[in-house]
Amino acid sequence: MQQDLLVYPDPKKQERYDRAYMRMAQEWSRLSHCTRKKVGALIVKDGMIISDGYNGTPTGFPNDCEDAQGLTLWYVLHAEANAIMKVARSTNNARNATLYLTHSPCKECSKLILQAGIKRLVYLNDYKDPSGLDLLEKGGILLQRLVMD
């Protein structure tokens, strides 16, 4: 693990914080109105939470994420995209930050993660298509799959 990307040099302390942030991302996922899959995201920089997000429809749209057949509507925003856009609207940025995700990102969101300057991704569950993780790995992002009790 690249030490310069970690806030805490003690691995045990870093793991405690990683788990705490992931539990918070899980809480954020519960705010999603999506029924098929609820995903939460947290962006942490220099030991501070600078953004959060969960999957859902754009502001002003009905909070219905799936169509009558239960398929996700094309315009539903992913949790990490919401979190990245939220920090982009602020006076802060995600450069050298850690992104905590309850599910690994899709390939489209992986491009956003790279462009945002995020350097570390901690995730809990695998997305069905691993190409997002492959892209992040090629881009030099430190990837860590967390196993929670």
Where do the language-model regions lie?
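Zinc-dependent deaminase catalytic domain
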Residues: 1-149
